[in-house]
């Protein structure tokens, strides 16, 4: 969302700001782990593996390559072909020793070709290691430690007008919302040509009527409307079978406070039972209390219509792909980067299994604000919600970029000029 004004799905950690119950036997990340640990100013989150250091075993990634990976690579290439991608290097990823825009984009082209040209793992691995450098994350502990949670994209029943059963709105972007034109980060509320002030609290915004007339869609409950705000985009199922898509259009500068963390702190839901279903059940039983906790989150999100062709889209503005797209902190990790993720993933039964895949860094999220955090996109709808809700496992990740001497050999394909209209000449 940040940057391209589209966003992600519901991050289980973003909704809670607290990890939801993981696998059947809850995983045991390091007890003293500080996954929110921040790097020193100007420090790079990645370290290049030296010539004598062993690469990760890519066997699992090779075996798990599939049509989803190919689709995600195509989406990545589409993003690199857009002019806006160039502005991310080095302005938002100021580490040219890791990769430049040319290097990052060429890496995707080269990787796609290597995948297509090599039918066996040995040949692929040989070519891959010859042409690419491997960079491991420092993670939260300087040793590569990363907490992997999950997110998904839901569908919501909604109405374009306020009617019985649909009385809780989300709003269009107000004209006085001031945001950074490059990063999309909230600055405040412009009250005059020379003055920008902080936005009021969530409770004040809702009670004051200051957004009256900007209602974009109405939802059955305050919790639904809030989840849409946390999600940042939504597919709306309207009366009569119509479908509408809404996406992120900005947010206020208020402090983000996770609903789940608030509920656990107040003793309303035990930490080891925290998930979206538990929050919904509590809301059905005691909506006033949950709404009070919602009001503690003063980051208020605004929306706009969009055509849905790229839904669900990540922060790069391209469609995210099940179990291939990863959301990371884009202030420390390279957007669009080719990755290898080594962790465990939750199954529908709640058990866990090894998860080793080539993936792509195509998204970000409100709770993903450190090198020791990453969110895996699990898909759309209720089934994906189950996987996202159970995903809470530690692991590590690596990025791969072409060695400089190969970059010029793998440029983005030149765009074909459009043919002139019939009867016209240039």
Predicted regions and their residues:
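C-terminal motif of bacterial Sec signal peptides marking the signal peptidase cleavage site
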Residues: 19-22
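C-terminal soluble interaction/assembly domains
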Residues: 308-426
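C-terminal segment of N-terminal export signals and the immediately downstream linker at the start
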Residues: 29-33, 37
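Bacterial N-terminal signal peptides that target proteins for export
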Residues: 1-8
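Short amphipathic alpha-helical segments with coiled-coil-like heptad repeat character
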Residues: 2, 81-84, 341-347
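Sec-dependent N-terminal signal peptides
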Residues: 8-14
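Secretory/export targeting leaders with adjacent low-complexity proregions
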Residues: 37-307, 314-318
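Bacterial signal peptide processing site
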Residues: 24-27
